[in-house]
Curated annotation (Swiss-Prot):
<dbReference type="Pfam" id="PF13801">
    <property type="entry name" value="Metal_resist"/>
</dbReference>
<keyword id="KW-0732">Signal</keyword>
<comment type="similarity">
    <text>Belongs to the ZraP family.</text>
</comment>
<dbReference type="InterPro" id="IPR025961">
    <property type="entry name" value="Metal_resist"/>
</dbReference>
<protein>
    <recommendedName>
        <fullName>Zinc resistance-associated protein homolog</fullName>
    </recommendedName>
</protein>
<keyword id="KW-0862">Zinc</keyword>
<feature type="signal peptide">
    <location>
        <begin position="1"/>
        <end position="28"/>
    </location>
</feature>
């Protein structure tokens, strides 16, 4: 029975870790308060007209407004799962139920990200991969620089900027 609980706890924690990376402050601009997608997204963004950049920014802002409640719920479920996983009196069914709830929230998040990809293609004219970045393309929970000097994510990111300055307009925005 203890080995089952440990195994379920490990599975649950692995789920939460991959969840946390996907649910962190999201995406897009290589500058600013979001994770960049690396050098190519930063270059693609800078190549857009000011009007297209404004549309890109508004789509990202709308996306963040939609997914912030999902992120909050994911964080609450993650915290609860951590607490239950370390409690020897927790029933495996409780952990299973919680991981199912987390999976449902992740699915909702990915749906919103896929909608963002479609909107970016249609309205801005660039192909993005927010829905498929998953745990490999995003920074994890915590501080640090994003992929192009943006805020959020773990580590220094793919493109370390001088003195913490972002690559665009000489500053983090």
């Amino acid at each position: 029975m203890n080995s089952k609980r440990i195994a379920l706890g490990i599975i649950a924690l692995a789920t939460v870790v991959s969840l946390g990376t996907a649910a962190n402050n999201a995406f897009a601009r290589g500058h600013g308060n979001y994770h960049g997608q690396g050098q190519m997204m930063g270059q693609a963004y800078e190549a857009l007209t000011p009007e297209k950049q404004a549309k890109f920014d508004s789509l990202i802002d709308a996306f963040n407004t939609k997914v912030t409640p999902l992120r909050d719920k994911l964080w609450a479920k993650h915290t609860e799962l951590n607490a239950l996983s370390s409690n020897p009196n927790t029933k495996p069914e409780d952990i299973r139920k919680l991981t199912d709830e987390i999976t449902a929230l992740r699915t909702q998040y990915r749906t919103e990200a896929a909608n963002l990809d479609a909107s970016m293609q249609k309205e801005v004219g660039i192909k993005t991969h927010f829905a498929t970045m998953g745990h490999r393309g995003m920074g994890g929970m915590g501080g640090g620089c994003g992929m192009m000097g943006g805020k959020g994510g773990m580590g220094s990111g793919m493109m370390q900027m001088h003195d913490g300055e972002g690559p665009h307009r000489g500053q983090n925005m």
